[in-house]
């Protein structure tokens, strides 16, 4: 993607990954109501411009809807899976204050994020085998230096059970 347009750094993976708000699984929809004019909504405009892309990147399951120039004062509304709605007033707040506030009320705790990261690292540990969805390797034969699968390359005669049984029977 070319680095053109207004503030193109917002579209880089490094910038998107730096967002620190990861919502709880109960958050399903987020609506942002703001105005494109006026001093009171400056923080909301900056929040939409700089922080919404990070939130979208970190929370792909959350639907985000923007409503411009439809309200006298800017606010955020979150719809939870229980049917509950959380209303956040963002008038006179800066975009950083808005981020801290929504992280505090609807974001996952730091301990939870660390536990999930540790679990993810354990799941993709190179010593684990299983379906590609969960592990790096499906079979032990994919490890270099190991005996290949008998279905792909026939085993040496000395390693087969039939040969060992015949050898025991003959002695």
UniProtKB/Swiss-Prot annotation:
The keyword Ribosomal protein applies. This is Small ribosomal subunit protein mS25. Keywords: Mitochondrion, Ribonucleoprotein, Ribosomal protein. GO terms for biological process: mitochondrial translation. GO terms for molecular function: structural constituent of ribosome. The keyword Ribonucleoprotein applies. It comes from the Eukaryota. Its main location: mitochondrion. Pfam families: L51_S25_CI-B8 (PF05047). Component of the mitochondrial ribosome small subunit (28S) which comprises a 12S rRNA and about 30 distinct proteins. It is found in: Mitochondrion. PANTHER family: MITOCHONDRIAL RIBOSOMAL PROTEIN S25, SMALL RIBOSOMAL SUBUNIT PROTEIN MS25. GO terms for cellular component: mitochondrial inner membrane; mitochondrial small ribosomal subunit; mitochondrion. Belongs to the mitochondrion-specific ribosomal protein mS25 family. InterPro entries: Ribosomal_mL43/mS25/NADH_DH, Ribosomal_mS25/mL61, Thioredoxin-like_sf.
